[in-house]
Amino acid sequence: MNKEEQEDPQQEQISTVQENDPRNLQQLGMLLVSPGLDEDRLSEKMISKIKKSRDIEKNQKLLISRLSQKEEDHSGKPPTITTSPAEKTVPFKSLNHSLKRKRVPPALNFSDIQASSHLHGSKSAPPNITRFPQHKNSLRVRYMGRMAPTNQDYHPSVANSYMTATYPYPYTGLPPVPCYPYSSTPTQTHAYEGYYSPMYPGPLYNNGIIPADYHAKRKKLAGRSPHLEDLTSRKRTFVSKHHNGDPIISKTDEDIECSVTKNSLSEGASLNDDADDDNDKERIIIGEISLYDDVFKFEVRDDKNDYMKACETIWTEWHNLKK
């Protein structure tokens, strides 16, 4: 421990001697003093950049001094900057750039415009919307009329011989059939070889008997529209399949793909639309709904919400007819 204590003061003396050395002080002084720029060693490009930086510095100082001044009105002469008495005064070029907008234009007064003015009938340009068709009334529901009941559309098979015998024959309204005598004949003898026993006669229908209201029904059917005749034929096939036990398939709804032309677009559509665009095609569902004897026809887009709305409108119109 004593040896270490003896060595410490010696080290402190050596450090103080080095700090007091005049050579070290001279080197520090040379480092602190700035000798400046030697123009002989600089190129013309470097000297021009230095001058530009000085001009920029002067302009910035001038702008700061102008913003700090409270008085806005000053003399029209451009201010001069005096950096030092040895240098010449450099005039500052005032630029008409303001940080604040001083000249605000007045508001337009539309109340002074007369009716005969050319600005009265002006309106804005149409909006540039997409080229998809704009359907204002996508739901189309129409009442087709009443269809005759089912039991009035079928006629007896005697009057209409062209009809098939798929319907059950009314056995109650047939006239009495005369019974012919039947006599048994020998069948094993040579004299009666090839002779067969006569068959029982079938029921004899009187073709001259026609229902009284048949001609009235024919006149009534002749005055119908072809659309209602199509409905009656569908109902007739439905009842025939129901009697025969065949599976019934409903074909009232039809999916029709129709192309919406450019004329069906709204007035606000863009004028730059292409006529041959593939987006102008849309699927439309056409169908019929019959409530008892009332028939409604509808045309809607291929959308569930539109179909439900069509059903609601048909339901309300049908209830209004019953009132």
From Swiss-Prot:
Keywords recorded for this protein, A-Z: Nucleus, Phosphoprotein
MF annotations from Gene Ontology:
transcription corepressor activity
List, as start-end ranges, the regions of compositional bias called Polar residues: 11-26
Protein modification: Phosphorylated by FUS3 and KSS1, in a pheromone-stimulated manner.
For this record, an example GO cellular component is:
Ste12p-Dig1p-Dig2p complex
Record PTM Phosphoserine, positions in chain: 34, 225, 266, 270
| GO-annotated biological processes | cellular response to pheromone; negative regulation of invasive growth in response to glucose limitation; negative regulation of mating-type specific transcription, DNA-templated; negative regulation of pseudohyphal growth; negative regulation of transcription by RNA polymerase II
Keyword flag Phosphoprotein = yes
Main localisation, per the record? nucleus
Extra remark: Present with 1310 molecules/cell in log phase SD medium.
Subunit record text: Forms a complex with DIG1, STE12 and either FUS3 or KSS1. The interaction of FUS3 with STE12 depends on the presence of both DIG1 and DIG2. STE12 is lost from FUS3/DIG1/DIG2 complex after pheromone treatment. DIG1 and DIG2 have also been reported to interact with CLN1 and CLN2.
What's the protein called, per UniProt? Down-regulator of invasive growth 2
Source species of the chain: Saccharomyces cerevisiae (strain ATCC 204508 / S288c) (Baker's yeast)
